């Protein structure tokens, strides 16, 4: 991602699991782009608002139960014309498999998909990989 960015732009990544820091930070620091990437350890719901960022692109790959909350938070800071990418929106087919209707993560993804589908502020599509 950083390779395709314009000079002066940056990536801010939020990681709630501090155990991931020891694994991830050396990769970031040894990449060709360390000044462009900020890794913030902690809860995005507490840390993002005081940062007052304008977001061009957000990538959601977090607790599936909270995708709706991540979306609503990010929308407050997303610039006009910005993008939100969300991982696992098909959740390995679980979102259409009735056997997973009571699974909390599947419910979270379904709620997210329904919210985005109904949100007239955004253009949307699912790109299955």
For every predicted segment, state its role.
Residues 1-129:
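S-adenosylmethionine/decaboxylated-SAM
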